[in-house]
Amino acid sequence: MIARVVPKLPYINKEHTVNFYVDKLRFTLQSDYGDYLIMSLDSAELHFFSYPGLKPEKSDFMIYLRVEENIEGLYQQYQKDGVAIHPNGKLEDKPWNQREFAIIDPNGTLLTFGQPC
């Protein structure tokens, strides 16, 4: 039986990736296996693998992070912490009944945060 899905995301520079997710997004670094990282925030878990040839400006990697409550507070906290919101990713209600905002990590991965309206 499948318990949950855990995304595996690429990184170019481990230090920049850890600093971004831990210092800016408030994730916890759970494990560091050299070229493989595991981080978590609340019930979300992300795995990261080294991908030296990745071009952030051409990355097609993206994930959707479901927010259970207070997406406005999370959005405001990230802005206060200096997290750059994607120019097309300001907090807004979408036609698919989700309130969303988006950011791009240092590796070019699009992170969309969403909560049902």
Regions of interest found by a model, annotated:
Residues K24-L29, V83-I85:
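Conserved acetyl-CoA-binding loop of GNAT-fold acetyltransferases
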